[in-house]
From Swiss-Prot:
Molecular function (Gene Ontology), one example: coreceptor activity
Signal sequence interval, chain numbering: 1-45
Transmembrane feature ranges: 151-172
GO cellular component: adrenomedullin receptor complex; cell surface; cytoplasm; plasma membrane; receptor complex
Subcellular location: Cell membrane
Subunit structure: Heterodimer of CALCRL and RAMP2; the interaction forms the receptor complex for adrenomedullin/ADM. Heterodimer of CALCR and RAMP2; interaction forms the AMYR2 receptor complex for calcitonin/CALC and amylin/IAPP.
Pfam families from the UniProt entry: RAMP (PF04901)
Organism, as annotated: Rattus norvegicus
Cytoplasmic side of membrane: 173-182
GO biological processes: adenylate cyclase-activating G protein-coupled receptor signaling pathway; adherens junction assembly; adrenomedullin receptor signaling pathway; amylin receptor 2 signaling pathway; angiogenesis; basement membrane assembly; bicellular tight junction assembly; calcium ion transport
Membrane topology field: Single-pass type I membrane protein
Extracellular side: 46-150
Protein name: Receptor activity-modifying protein 2
Length: 182
């Protein structure tokens, strides 16, 4: 190990310096240096390389499950599509709710049967496709409000107008009585 000398820094504090003229505080044990290099190597890897997953047995099984799930839910989609084609008004929920609920139930049941979560990407794409095909032109129908009959409207306008002078008179009359008592 190199001998240490103590020197003063320009500000007046003492620094321990090795014979190689390096501050002793910067010397690191080899194990700590190796750990630091490993950490820097892990941090400097690109995020793209971290996101790449190598196919494992589970991921291949999951891919097989998704393919089987897709083949099992296609009849659900075809049944829904043919049922919806027979409906005249696609925007009337009472007419289409049964078919839509059956599609959703079928997608969820098949996902559960294959051990997949619901909603999953395939189920979401089928539901989105259903919305794009059948409900794209549907909008929320808001009831249009009309004016009340004239006699009700006049009563609602005249009542506050007549009430205001009476209330002003009452306030003025009560405030005069209050001043006289004080």
């Amino acid at each position: 190990m190199a001998p240490l000398r103590v020197e003063r820094a320009p500000g007046g504090s003492q620094l321990a310096v090795t014979s190689a003229q390096r501050p002793a505080a910067l010397r690191l044990p080899p194990l700590l240096l190796l750990l630091l290099l490993l950490l820097l190597g892990a941090v400097s890897t690109s995020p793209e390389s971290l996101n790449q997953s190598h196919p494992t047995e589970d991921s291949l099984l999951s891919k097989g499950k998704m393919e089987d799930y897709e083949t099992n839910v296609l009849p659900c989609w075809y049944y829904y599509k043919t049922s919806m084609d027979s409906v005249k008004d696609w925007c009337n929920w009472t007419l289409i709710s049964r078919y839509y609920s059956n599609l959703r139930y079928c997608l969820e049941y098949e996902a559960d049967k294959f051990g997949l979560g619901f909603p999953n990407p395939l189920a979401e794409s089928i539901i989105l496709e259903a919305h794009l095909i059948h409900f794209a032109n549907c909008s929320l129908v808001q009831p249009t409000f009309s004016d009340p009959p004239e006699d009700v409207l006049l009563a609602m306008i005249i009542a506050p107008i007549c009430l205001i002078p009476f209330l002003v008179t009452l306030v003025v009359w009560r405030s005069k009585d209050g001043d006289a008592q004080a």
